[in-house]
Every structure is written in C-alpha cells, then in structure tokens.
C-alpha cells in the first residue's frame, strides 16, 4: 500500500495510504480526542469493574487492538507548533501533550515521535564556533518521558564554520564540501541501550532517504 495513497488523473484520492495526515493545527486535548476515537475504532479498551461502598467503578487496565501486528506511530511535526491549551504557555502546552502521549504509549502501545526544530541565535553560534570539532548537539531539557532522544545536526552549515566534525575533515583546502549531504545523528538519551551514540549519514532530501557515509582516506 503506498504511504500517501493512490490518486487518479484529476488528483482525487481513490485509495487511502498508510499515513493519515492531520493538516489543521490543534491543541493537545483535541489531538487526544482524535487519538481516542482512533483507538476505539481500531481496538477496545479493557476495564476492570469493582464495587466499593455500593458504588461501581470501572478502572482502565489495558487495550486490545483488533490487529495486533499493526504498529501505530504518531509523528508530531513539530511539537512547538501545537495550539495553546486553555491559555497555557508553550512549555505547558508541550508538557500536556507529552502527558497524553505517555497515556497512549502505556495503554495502547502507540509510538510517538516528537519533532522539535531548534534555531540557534547568532550570538550562540558565535560562542560555539570556538568549539570547532567539539561542537555537537546537546539538550538541557530532555523529557523524562522519552524512551530515546535523538538530535540531528548539519555540520556543513556555513554559520557554524566547522573544518572538521568528530574527527572527519569536512572541506578541501579550497573550501569545497567533501560530504555535501552529510548529517550526524546523535542518540543523546536512552532507556534501553548505551548512550551517547553518534552516526554519520547522507541525507538525500529529494527522495527522503538516508545512506551510509563512506569516509574518504
């Protein structure tokens, strides 16, 4: 099944793809409501009934998907663009969505991929230029709820003025890029494996692919 679905000559979709796009911005609670409806359509919640002092309680204890082989991955691109929740500030809004994500992860086993775009200020860039090849992404605000925290960095960006990165020479003596599609991916936090870990890849944006970087001797 195509990821984006199938379309006829008029551009009309004739078959749904694997990806469901939510184009309109929304707040965390509205997204949670959509996910709740999706979960109910594709499975059933399991409750345990108990009675105390004559009052009946239904406690949520699990979720059973109709298709146990189906993986549900929710990608938020990007997290800071969520609409404010009840007048919350940005951090409070992000924290609320993270809280909801943990609920669905723990109960429904949904996987959440939160994307955050970071823009360094000019003053910060100038300060970090002196680090040269020691420059690599770090986060001082790692979410305790994340299983894995990855960062991606473009060492070829002119504003960083790097000559080498993690021991890899980036430019020829004439200033030409040796690895024009180079990106470095960094596993900075993990609950399930050793970290940090660092990886070099070629990012081919046109085809949305990553390939291994072969270091030139």
Language model regions located:
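Phosphate-binding/switch region of NTP-binding enzymes
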Residues: 102-216
